[in-house]
Amino acid sequence: MSAPLKRTPLAEEHLAAGARMVDFGGWDMPLAYGSQLEEHHAVRQDAGMFDVSHMLNVDVGGADATAFLRRLVANDVARLATPGKALYSCMLNPQGGIIDDLIIYYFAPDQWRVVVNAGTADKDIAWMQRVAAADGFDVAIAPRRDLAMVAVQGPNARAKVWAARPAWQAASEPLAPFSAAAVEAGTLVARTGYTGEDGFEIVLPADAVVQLWRDLLAQGVRPCGLGARDTLRLEAGMNLYGQDMDELVHPDQAGLSWTVALKDEARRFVGRDAIEQFAVPRAFVGLKLQERGVMRAHMPVRCAQGMGELTSGTMSPTLGVSVGFARVPVGVQPGDAVEVEIRGKWVPALVCKLPFVRHGKAVEHS
């Protein structure tokens, strides 16, 4: 018998709003509250909010916290010197495969926070503890299931958060992208997101999230589900763990080589040896379909250099055409013509540099 689905502190709010709920990584999460298309456009044109409380915040502290994270992840946290600053990274296995992608926040040399994906949270914690024990790091790893998280995204997102919580504006208005600030005790506001739009991700005590959700709703922020979250992140050129990459995929094969810091040769992060010895046999590209149809994951892609495969695909609400990501042979370049097999028919597609949409506007590809 399968385990019951986990629920976030906002579960009753979703049900009361008529959300269609689905199993997402073992969590009962809203797919949509009505029109997925309208939710998508709300984020691109105004403001939408997502319950992301299924994601796990993990506090990492102790005398060796910085050294531990420099060993644990492929990006180099040593570049973070300003409290509240964050970076995106992959956590790799010894073979160079991606255990998870995550965001790491710096507060002090002995005080960090790591945000991991919901479906990999237990695996991630076990791996972090294993690395800490293997190398004898003096570090405390504390999962924070007492916290909830809401992402408010869109061109008007920040203004509507401030309308709902005026006291937060002074601390959060100066934030640069990929930075966070404590706006009150136990509450962190970060200028981050997963949509390609401006906005905040707000981490706060679980017992305070329902009132925040209701207050944002009163300011006209539209609740959005996983369906819109997926089309938004695809347009923005952002990977989804478990779909675009996993433990068998190296960062280079998922368009994430920019998250691997190799400059400091003395920093032997987990997976570095495999990364340095591995010749990348696949490239990761965006595709835009040139005729009618919808690309989906696992569809074959025919290129002049050989065969590839879609990892993600959807109909783009902003562009009105199907877009997707594909792993293809090395040598495939933006501007190349390829074909995607859809229902037994080979349909032409254009290879594009990501993203497809930036700040609500289509990115020109030729």
UniProtKB/Swiss-Prot annotation:
Entry EC number(s): 2.1.2.10
The keyword Nuclease is assigned to this record: no
EC primary class: transferase
GO biological process entries: glycine decarboxylation via glycine cleavage system
Domain of life assignment: Bacteria
Flavoprotein in keyword set: no
Catalytic reaction list: N(6)-[(R)-S(8)-aminomethyldihydrolipoyl]-L-lysyl-[protein] + (6S)-5,6,7,8-tetrahydrofolate = N(6)-[(R)-dihydrolipoyl]-L-lysyl-[protein] + (6R)-5,10-methylene-5,6,7,8-tetrahydrofolate + NH4(+)
GO molecular function: aminomethyltransferase activity; transaminase activity
Keywords: Aminotransferase, Transferase
GO cellular component terms attached to this protein's record: cytosol; glycine cleavage complex
Complex and partners: The glycine cleavage system is composed of four proteins: P, T, L and H.
Family the entry assigns: Belongs to the GcvT family.
Function: The glycine cleavage system catalyzes the degradation of glycine.
NCBIfam families registered for this protein in UniProt: gcvT, PRK00389.1
Descriptive protein name: Aminomethyltransferase
Provenance organism: Bordetella bronchiseptica (strain ATCC BAA-588 / NCTC 13252 / RB50)
Gene transcribed to yield this protein: gcvT
